[in-house]
UniProtKB/Swiss-Prot annotation:
This is Uncharacterized protein MJ1154. GO terms for biological process: dGTP catabolic process. The lineage of its organism: Archaea, Methanobacteriati, Methanobacteriota, Methanomada group, Methanococci. PROSITE patterns: HD. One of its GO terms (molecular function) is dGTPase activity. Residues 50-147 form the HD domain. Pfam families: HD (PF01966), HD_assoc_2 (PF19276). CDD domains: HDc. InterPro entries: dGTPase-like, HD/PDEase_dom, HD_assoc_2, HD_domain, HDIG_dom. NCBIfam families: HDIG (TIGR00277).
Length: 451
């Protein structure tokens, strides 16, 4: 048994089998992968890594597993390995089809894990069992650790949550033959604090304008090297931050040179959530990486400079789905918490589309009618609003109950994962209206939008 001192959780105990994993080459790589990408350019002390976050996630996950009588050993080792496939600078470089989950599974298959079942670990990381929901779910160990850790290392107080009370409030219940994780009614305030913490951390840290600009620049720097065949997307799975930065410097990548000097691009134009109509939002959130790069090529043709477009991912708001257990039965957090409901519009307000240009060209571009010219290019996008869920609502008019909606969708060949992802996007964009009535959700098309 060995004790590791952690800045967040203090003493973390590890047994010999876990130490073997930590001492592996694959896990040691995480020591040099920053947890929050290029956030250190704004918050200088944000130099913490995926290494300590993985330890922290294991610590919290094991506490939850003990509380709900899950497999503690499987939970701990799976939590340790949950980020093993991350590329340099973490989520920032999940580009060109790179998925840290996919590469993580590949690494696990090739690691020396004789003391554990690789298939069970992969099953857990795919959220196919209770242990997987502990690590990554509606209220999970991963999220709780990164909020506490990122808050501490950025020097902000926004991510502070009542971890002990959340852990005391976690329980399980059975629904349709499956064991699910929920929160006792006495823990509502603690879960609400988690919602607020996440919202504030996204606003102040993860979506900080300068952080987003730096992240976009490093993405484009790496994409350029991949396009020129100097780098393969698979290489990222074995590189850390140091290796990648060294490669970009040797390649004399001009964007890396600018990042090194903190000579960052500046915000040229911002489109907020409320600047765009539902169809425009739908078009933008469905643009893939290839289409975005094509747009940027059009900008270059028009202006003669690299101008980047940054479309922030739709907020997932998973915590709103947390089950609250009381004497009255099981309800979702949204049903019992006015605060949770009020945060949904605030989450939407955070979302925007930003267009960046070299700071030395901002004045010149603005003097040359840049916004109208960019708007003209954006209007050339030919993306149709196509959705099987919209087709279903055109046929049914109104559907009462999310489960009923899912059943109809499954009959049309739509998987549950596709259903939930598509529904979330459609509601976010304002193409489908969701309202809560008499303890159930009701869905219909937004009649103010012509489809």
């Amino acid at each position: 048994m060995k004790v590791i001192r952690d800045s967040i959780h203090k003493d973390i105990y590890l047994d010999e089998k876990e130490l073997e994993i930590i001492d592996s080459e694959e896990f040691q790589r995480l020591r040099n992968i920053k947890q929050t990408g290029l956030t250190y350019l704004v918050y200088p002390s944000a130099n913490h890594t995926r290494f300590e976050h993985s330890l922290g996630t294991m610590f919290i996950a094991s506490k939850i597993a003990e509380k709900i009588n899950a497999d503690v050993e499987l939970t701990r080792v799976s939590a340790l390995l949950h980020d093993i496939g991350h590329p340099p600078f973490s989520h920032t470089l999940e580009i060109c089809g790179y998925s840290h989950e996919v590469f993580g599974r590949k690494k696990i298959k090739h690691m020396n894990l004789d003391n554990f079942s690789k298939s069970e670990i992969i099953k857990t990381l795919n959220r196919k069992n209770l242990e997987g929901k502990i690590i990554s779910g509606d209220v999970d160990a991963d999220r709780m650790d990164y909020l506490l850790r990122d808050s501490y290392h950025t020097g902000t107080a926004y991510g502070m949550i009542d971890l002990p009370r959340i852990l005391r409030s976690i329980t399980t219940f059975e629904s349709f033959g499956k064991v699910k994780i929920g929160i006792l009614k006495k823990g509502i305030q603690a879960i609400e604090s988690l919602l607020v913490a996440r919202h504030q951390m996204y606003s102040a840290v993860y979506m900080h304008p300068t952080v987003r600009i730096a992240d976009t620049m490093i993405k484009r720097a790496v994409i350029k090297e991949i396009q020129e065949k100097n780098l393969d997307i698979k290489d990222l799975a074995n590189m850390d931050d140091i290796a990648l930065v060294s490669f970009l410097r040797i390649s004399e990548n001009y964007l890396m040179e600018r990042i090194d000097r903190r000579n960052l691009y500046k915000n040229l134009i911002t489109y907020s959530y409320f600047d765009l109509n539902p169809i425009e939002k739908w078009i933008f959130v469905n643009l893939d990486e290839k289409q975005i790069l094509s747009l940027e090529s059009r900008f270059y043709e028009e202006f003669g400079w690299d101008i980047f477009i940054d479309i922030y991912p739709i907020p997932k708001m998973e915590e709103h789905n947390v089950y609250i257990i009381s004497d009255e039965g099981v309800k979702r957090l949204d049903e019992v918490s006015p605060l949770a409901q009020s945060l949904k519009p605030s989450e939407m307000r955070l979302w925007n589309i930003s267009i960046y240009a070299p700071k030395e060209k901002i004045k010149e571009l603005r003097e040359n009618n840049v916004k109208d010219r960019i708007n003209k290019i954006l209007k050339e996008l030919d993306v149709k609003v196509e959705s099987k869920l919209i087709d279903i609502l055109k046929e049914y008019g109104t559907i009462t109950g999310k489960r009923r909606f899912l059943e109809i969708a499954k009959e049309r060949g739509i998987s549950p994962k596709e259903f939930y992802n598509e529904l979330h996007k459609l509601i976010f964009c304002g193409l489908i209206k969701e309202r809560f009535n008499r303890r159930t959700y009701v869905y219909c098309l937004n009649n103010f939008v012509k489809l």
